[in-house]
């Protein structure tokens, strides 16, 4: 992994920090299971997922059912100047939301492409901003929100598309 980076020492430090955090989390989880039992810890984890899902659904239910559209564009990809549309359609039905980026530009040669994970993360973050209370971030809060990113697009490019700026500008 680090061989594919211009700053391998930095990436190695990042990876080591992530691994250390995972090891601490593993120890704490095992300690909770030791103290409270696997069934009880699992039940509480499921309850937390359900709580986050319900809180996110409540946020979505405050939005009137319907379809909402928005379009913007970038004026170039760093390789040249041309119109690069980003289109989104937001469909709300009760406690469910679909955010569809179909119709957005195809992937480009420059580094403004954004990988699907960035687009989903930015979308879910926007939904969370609508919440009046803190929503615990876990898989439960993602369930009511479907994010569609068309393949081969600016927002879901094929490997090895350039994506460096997509993390901050496009996503």
Short names for language-model regions:
Residues 45, 108-119:
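Alpha-helix N-cap/helix-initiation motif
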Residues 1-55:
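N-terminal leader/propeptide and maturation segments of large enzyme subunits in energy/redox metabolism
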Residues 9, 30-46, 60-72, 132-146:
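Flexible, glycine/charged-enriched surface loops at secondary-structure junctions
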Residues 66-89:
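Flexible, glycine/threonine-enriched loop-and-boundary segments that flank and lead into catalytic domains
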Residues 84-103:
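Short beta-strand elements
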Residues 77-81, 97-98, 105-109, 137, ...:
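Flexible loop/turn segments at secondary-structure boundaries
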């Amino acid at each position: 992994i680090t061989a594919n980076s211009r700053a391998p020492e930095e990436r190695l430090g990042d990876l080591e920090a992530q691994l250390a955090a995972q090891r601490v989390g593993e120890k704490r989880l095992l300690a909770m299971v030791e103290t409270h039992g696997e069934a009880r810890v699992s039940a509480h984890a499921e309850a937390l997922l359900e709580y986050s899902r319900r809180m996110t659904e409540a946020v979505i239910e405050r939005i009137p059912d319907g379809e909402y559209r928005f379009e913007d564009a970038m004026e170039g990809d760093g390789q040249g100047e041309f119109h690069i549309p980003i289109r989104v359609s937001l469909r709300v039905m009760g406690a469910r939301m679909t955010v569809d980026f179909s119709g957005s530009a195809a992937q480009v040669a420059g580094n403004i492409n954004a990988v699907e994970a960035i687009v989903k993360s930015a979308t879910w973050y926007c939904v969370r901003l609508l919440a009046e209370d803190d929503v615990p971030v876990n898989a439960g809060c993602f369930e009511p929100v479907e994010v569609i990113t068309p393949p081969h697009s600016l927002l879901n490019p094929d490997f090895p598309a350039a994506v460096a700026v997509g993390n901050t500008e496009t996503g």
